[in-house]
A protein has these predicted regions:
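C-terminus-biased signal that marks the final domain/tail of proteins
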Residues: 79-252
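Cysteine-dependent hydrolase recognition
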Residues: 30, 45, 51, 71, ...
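A contiguous strand-loop segment
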Residues: 1-72, 100-104, 200
Length: 252
């Protein structure tokens, strides 16, 4: 399971900017791009071979590791999700990209055509990536930073939304509290809402279910909460979504 929590100025996004639109792809993977109409590239996406990709900001004082010259990271993520066949081919594309800004990435893959149980953790591969023009660091759960605020947890790769230690609630402490029973409802009710992260877009990708739970901010809703992490999430069955026929234009 993967959580992508976009934090931005949620007051500026109107309800008309997130709509369903399907475009036919005959020579590449079908994929779902979770973002906004008019946003070029990807910030969170998932394709029909169960590869998922998302990002969060990577704040670093080492300014020399970034560049404004190259392929914007949103374009790179879009290419990866459309053309990568596996987590290995996705890594190759990311390594060879003309990288620019520094971002944290989460890259996952579900091995759906295996003989193991559907809920077997061995069916899921997931990596955390520090991505920038001059640095590219890959972390499995065993390689994650191991500190008091950021403990290593088996089969869990995570980036804290806040610099630790700080007065902000740490993601690590919440993961420890709920470890062993972390599912999409638990993440939505007890983790992202407590951290108050994902105010513009909050997306939980469940690889076992082949489903996405997603919520957007709603600045035009006079009654409900504005922030995405506080709103009701919509569950999308990705197998059914990818099977939806492409709309046709009536020549008449």
């Amino acid at each position: 399971m993967t959580v992508y929590h976009l934090n931005a100025s949620y007051e500026g996004y109107a309800k008309h900017f997130h709509q369903y639109y399907k475009q036919p792809y005959k020579t590449t993977h079908t994929f779902a791009n979770f973002g906004y109409i008019g946003l070029i590239g990807s910030i969170g996406a998932y394709n029909d071979v169960s590869i998922g990709l998302g990002q969060k900001v990577w704040i670093t004082t080492e300014q020399d590791i970034t560049s404004r010259l190259g392929n914007p990271w949103t374009y790179v993520l879009r290419d990866v999700i459309q053309f990568a066949d596996s987590i290995d081919s996705a890594l190759t594309m990311l390594v060879n990209a003309h990288r620019t800004c520094s971002v944290h990435l989460g890259l996952g893959e579900y091995h759906r055509n295996t003989s193991g149980r559907e809920d077997d953790d061995d069916n899921v591969g997931f990596l955390g990536i520090e991505y920038s023009a001059k640095e590219f660091n890959v972390f499995a759960w065993e390689d994650m930073y191991n500190t008091t605020q950021h403990p290593v947890l088996e089969n869990v790769v995570y980036w804290d939304p806040y610099v630790q230690p700080s007065n902000n609630t740490c993601l690590g402490s919440l993961l420890v509290e709920h470890y062993g029973r972390i599912d999409a409802p638990t993440v939505i009710r007890n983790i992202t809402s407590v951290l108050k992260t994902g105010n513009t877009l909050n997306m939980v990708l469940d690889y076992n279910e082949n489903a996405v739970y997603i919520a957007y901010s709603a600045p035009e809703d006079p009654q409900g909460p504005i922030e995405a992490f506080n709103r009701v999430h919509t569950r999308i069955d990705m197998a059914k979504l990818f099977a939806e026929p492409v709309p046709t234009i009536d020549d008449e």
